[in-house]
Design a protein with these regions (language model features):
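Gram-negative outer-membrane beta-barrel transporters
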Residues: 9-10, 129-131, 153-247, 323-325
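Conserved C-terminal beta-signal and adjacent last beta-strands/turns
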Residues: 61, 67, 74, 105-112, ...
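Switch/connector loops and helix/strand junctions flanking conserved nucleotide-binding motifs
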Residues: 87, 134, 284-287
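Structural signature of Gram-negative outer-membrane beta-barrels, strongest in the C-terminal barrel
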Residues: 1-132, 182, 223-225, 229
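Solvent-exposed loop segments that connect transmembrane elements
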Residues: 13-52, 94-98, 137-151, 189-209, ...
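Hydrophobic, aliphatic-enriched repeat segments that assemble into extended interaction scaffolds
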Residues: 1-17, 120-121, 169-183, 266-282
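Hydrophobic pocket-lining residues within nucleotide cofactor-binding pockets
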Residues: 84, 186, 281
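Membrane-embedded beta-barrel scaffold of Gram-negative outer-membrane proteins
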Residues: 72-81, 104-161, 166, 170-176, ...
Length: 328
């Protein structure tokens, strides 16, 4: 059994401008004008001032781990961790949270499973639950088909239930293999936002219970390594990322893909090391990440964008890199 804890004092003091930005924005007094029913122009005075925000808080964390051997090689394992923190100063970018929205972020993790060890394999298989409450995000919502965007403050939760099996394998001398398989389902909770654009049209996004964007549900890792000599080794790395959603409402997605790497490392002597590595061995092509400006697109509207060009990130092309390290 292993257990531990941490207590952290957190103080934040800053000057906050909570007013949204607009054309001609400036600190101090300004007027807005409207036309009354009788045709006269009515001026309304406003003032923008920085207000001090000071927080004195305690963040805490605790962990407990249990391991029980049923035999010399086989056993059960479980652990639980909880960590908390209050919003950081960086999360006050834009309008920032109000006093009512300033809440403790809580991250609990619970997992348990089995393990098996012998002379050539170290195997574990575990089920994991993890969540995060009161996550703060400044989300830019772009009106589909235009460049007009509005930034809104979102406070939501994320939770994940997953299963991971990993193995460290040494079947013969000088060879090592790391293997991992993960199936997970990370979903948004309480994720709702709406925005009104300059033409008066209101649009909303509801990602509640939808898969978190950019996070695949299936992950596979295969990492073989062979020591040719004491100072020379060759390695490969294969990563599979399953289908990932490119926007909040599961309307757009990228198919699963492999990312492959390999190389040779040579420690020439105590002061010099050389290496060569290959990225994207099979020169697989495709896109990944998110699609900018797509957050308000729904599943029903996705068909309208078939065959259209949209911006995102791409898989790194086939690349060969040479490296050298010198120690003085």
């Amino acid at each position: 059994m292993f257990y531990g804890g941490r207590l952290e004092y957190y103080r934040m003091s800053a000057e906050q401008i909570s007013a949204p930005r607009f054309s001609g924005f400036h600190m101090g007094n300004y007027n807005t004008y409207a036309t009354a029913a009788d045709g006269s122009v009515v001026a309304t005075e406003h003032s923008i001032e920085a207000k001090n925000v000071t927080k004195d808080k305690l963040n805490y964390a605790a962990t407990l781990q249990l391991t029980y051997n049923l035999t010399r090689q086989f056993g059960l394992t479980a652990d639980a961790t909880i960590a908390t923190r209050f919003p950081r100063i960086s999360e006050y970018a834009g309008t920032g949270p109000t006093e009512e929205q300033y809440k403790r972020v809580t991250i609990p993790l619970i997992r348990g499973g089995i393990f098996y060890k012998n002379d050539w394999i170290d195997l574990s298989s575990m089920v994991t639950y993890i969540s995060k409450s009161n996550n703060i995000d400044q989300q830019n919502l772009t009106k589909p088909g235009t460049t007009e965007g509005k930034t809104v403050l979102l406070i939501y939760n994320i939770q994940t239930l997953g299963w991971t099996t990993s193995a460290e394998i040494n079947p013969f001398k000088n060879f090592h293999m790391h293997a991992l398989f993960t199936y997970q389902k990370p979903v948004y909770k309480n994720y709702n936002a709406s925005v009104t654009f300059s033409d008066g049209q209101s649009m909303g996004v509801n990602a509640n219970n939808m898969i978190v964007k950019e996070i695949p549900q299936v992950l596979i890792e295969l990492d073989p390594k062979y020591d040719i000599t004491k100072n020379l080794n060759a390695w490969l790395s294969f990563r599979y990322f399953g289908k990932t959603y490119a926007n909040l409402q599961e309307a757009l997605y990228f198919n699963g893909h492999w990312e492959t790497f390999g190389g040779i490392n040579w420690n020439v002597n105590k002061k010099l090391s050389l290496g060569v590595s290959v990225i994207n061995i099979f020169n697989e092509k495709g896109a990944k990440g998110t699609i900018s400006g797509s957050e308000l697109i729904t599943k029903q509207e996705a068909g309208k964008y078939d065959g259209k060009y949209m911006s995102g990130s791409y898989l790194r092309p086939f690349t060969v890199e040479f490296s050298a390290g010198i120690k003085f």
